[in-house]
From Swiss-Prot:
GO term, biological process aspect, one: ribonucleoside diphosphate catabolic process
Organism: Schizosaccharomyces pombe (strain 972 / ATCC 24843)
The protein's name in its UniProt record: Uncharacterized Nudix hydrolase P35G2.12
Enzyme class: hydrolase
Similarity comment: family membership: Belongs to the Nudix hydrolase family.
Pfam family, one: NUDIX
Amino acid sequence: MSQDQKPKVLEVSNLENQDAKWTSLKKIRWQDEKGKIRFWEMAERTTRSEANVDAVAILAIVPIDGSPHVLCQKQFRPPIGKFCIEIPAGLVDSKESCEDAAIRELREETGYVGTVMDSTTVMYNDPGLTNANLKIILADIDMSKPENQNPQQQLDDGEYIENFPIKLSSLQEELFSLEKKGFAIDVRLSTFALGLHAGLKYLSS
């Protein structure tokens, strides 16, 4: 990934709902189990698809030298002011299925063409803060296919994404190493790594 200069946050200011494109801030009036009226602040996604899912993240598995690797990304994220290690992801278009969105986003962000193998249930990112949700789609990348021989990203203006593989057997260890180097680790990738580690520890015996 070639860049002229290192990205950085220049200013953070308040944003009115009428000026926001992707999210809005809402106040919820609700009643608890005792009948008491309470209030809650929430951030709301304003771009939800007809599938009632905001986004997909793609857990793309690619074989390298006979070993499965997960395709990861490095991308600067302004809300945290640092580079984040994550997996390919993006919003689901209005009339798009989650599976189609996953294949499209994978190709746009990495250049690879994948095959959907499985998916999670609808998952809520931070239900104490927002209604934003997503599905994680498991996809295989067949490196023998002609379309995967010379992958070319199709990034939008302002997108700068570096893709790199991490071996599944050392994913947890590698993420800790990257964190020590100053990178943020996305919750989806970190949770997968912990689940993989726990599965190998508790289910292999």
